[in-house]
Amino acid sequence: MNIQALLSEKVSQAMIAAGAPADCEPQVRQSAKVQFGDYQANGMMAVAKKLGMAPRQLAEQVLTHLDLSGIASKVEIAGPGFINIFLEPAFLSEQVQQALTSDRLGVSQPTRQTIVVDYSAPNVAKEMHVGHLRSTIIGDAAVRTLEFLGHHVIRANHVGDWGTQFGMLIAWLEKQQQENAGDMALADLEGFYRDAKKHYDEDEAFAERARNYVVKLQSGDTYFREMWRKLVDITMTQNQITYDRLNVTLTRDDVMGESLYNPMLPGIVADLKAKGLAVESEGATVVFLDEFKNKEGDPMGVIIQKKDGGYLYTTTDIACAKYRYETLHADRVLYYIDSRQHQHLMQAWTIVRKAGYVPDSVPLEHHMFGMMLGKDGKPFKTRAGGTVKLADLLDEALERARRLVAEKNPDMSADELEKLANAVGIGAVKYADLSKNRTTDYIFDWDNMLAFEGNTAPYMQYAYTRVLSVFRKADIDEQALASAPVIISEDREAQLAARLLQFEETLTVVAREGTPHVMCAYLYDVAGLFSGFYEHCPILSAENDAVRNSRLKLAQLTAKTLKLGLDTLGIETVERM
């Protein structure tokens, strides 16, 4: 259930009855402090200004029309005209009971949409590096959240699988008598890429052959298509190992590489010319956009076809957006691409809108993110200053987690230790990233991310096992517990219950904004509130069975919420730590 939405509806009706316009915004928010209640309606300021009256006067009139019987125990006006709403304990009890009867914890399903999510996007013939981490795991958390809410999500892994470099790679493989590329590991291809580039730059005859191979590949020659396909297959097989290690839901079926849009490009250029949007300029085909100005203050020219007939990333991105709307029938498209690509995407989408390829009713959203930095505040690198391979980073996470869990669990079996180390190590790397606002850069710090204190994966995983341990200690009759009422009489019980019931509101924000850090902050808050509740409200030694069972049910909803919340982030939980 979405309590915020319920209260917004009620306050909005009362505001309209008090003379506010029909489109008024009640601005119901979760209260920041306990003394301000559970929710606060802040919309009186803006509306009162329009009506030419004092906000407090409007708030008083709104209260005469506001019926929250059975929902709120107290409603009061604070400051210049804020309305503070305190939830009724009986209402909280009823909602906790409802949440426990459903696998979805009472989370309702919004109108189902088809949502395309573009994320990860590694390059062919190169190994994934830390630069791919943020897009991959933030995008996957968004996908998991949207799917949980009931949307039809299409994962789009926009792999870099086309371009002039393929002529160079095929020529080099051939020169090395390595046509049987299927037997090579990707680490070999990394070396091949470097060697091929060196040869291409230094040997004109080789470079000429590579250029000819590109033409043959692009014209659909069977042999060259087969060689190209081998390179793609080796890369994606290797990448799948990384995705599986990361507990990311991408599969081979989600690959929609640049090559997919290639056949569309000549038609796009011809159509943009026919619509008068693209013109010839110095031999190239260019779209001049008034929305973007160059240094001289003139409309910026965006090249969509070079003088030599080649296409650019912008052309591919135009085709890509068109395909996602026309062929995939997207109602919404999300792009998890770093912030440096923002202007490029905005230009492509401006052309897409002008050409009528995607209507304004279908949002194209750039959910950009900052960079991953080392402790020195510079881009995260190896000691030698090279790019950190993602597989190496995950190996190190696992090794550090092994040491950590072995130290804390000297008697655990080797199998159990390995499973636990995997959950903690991979979870720590992912959670450290997901818990930060994606729009900012963040410092990668092993010590912080593997700590058992603070907003970290190990702390959250431990908090979950701590709740489960209550049930292990209690000799519970499941049936008796299912039918037991929830009684909320203590402040800490009410605070925990109210926060647990804000799970749907949190999911809604993550789904709307693509901000997993909001879920991390929520779960951390729930864990903290449970800790206080556990300390001050005895569960197993409660004064009677009714109170004990009621508190066990609050603990049960806490465990289910933590598990489901961490699952939407792609963080594994464990039963014992």
Swiss-Prot record:
EC number(s) recorded for this UniProt protein: 6.1.1.19
Query: What does the UniProt entry say about where the protein is found?
Result: Cytoplasm
Against InterPro entries, the record matches this protein to: aa-tRNA-synth_I_CS, Arg-tRNA-ligase, Arg-tRNA-synth_N, Arg-tRNA-synth_N_sf, ArgRS_core, DALR_anticod-bd, Rossmann-like_a/b/a_fold, tRNAsynth_Ia_anticodon-bd
- Gene for this protein? argS
Example GO BP:
arginyl-tRNA aminoacylation
The protein here is known as Arginine--tRNA ligase
**Which SUPFAM superfamilies does UniProt cross-reference here?**
Anticodon-binding domain of a subclass of class I aminoacyl-tRNA synthetases, Arginyl-tRNA synthetase (ArgRS), N-terminal 'additional' domain, Nucleotidylyl transferase
Q: Name one Pfam family in it.
A: Arg_tRNA_synt_N
* Enzyme class, spelled out: ligase
Q: Name one GO molecular function term.
A: arginine-tRNA ligase activity
**Keywords (A to Z) from UniProt:** Aminoacyl-tRNA synthetase, ATP-binding, Cytoplasm, Ligase, Nucleotide-binding, Protein biosynthesis
Question: Which family, according to the similarity comment?
Answer: Belongs to the class-I aminoacyl-tRNA synthetase family.
Database matches in HAMAP family: Arg_tRNA_synth (MF_00123)
Q: Which Gene3D superfamilies match?
A: Arginyl tRNA synthetase N-terminal domain (3.30.1360.70), HUPs (3.40.50.620), Isoleucyl-tRNA Synthetase, Domain 1 (1.10.730.10)
Origin species, per record, is: Salmonella gallinarum (strain 287/91 / NCTC 13346)
Q: Which reaction does it catalyse?
A: tRNA(Arg) + L-arginine + ATP = L-arginyl-tRNA(Arg) + AMP + diphosphate
Report motif location: 'HIGH' region.
122-132
Oligomeric and partner information: Monomer.
Provide one Gene Ontology cellular component: cytoplasm
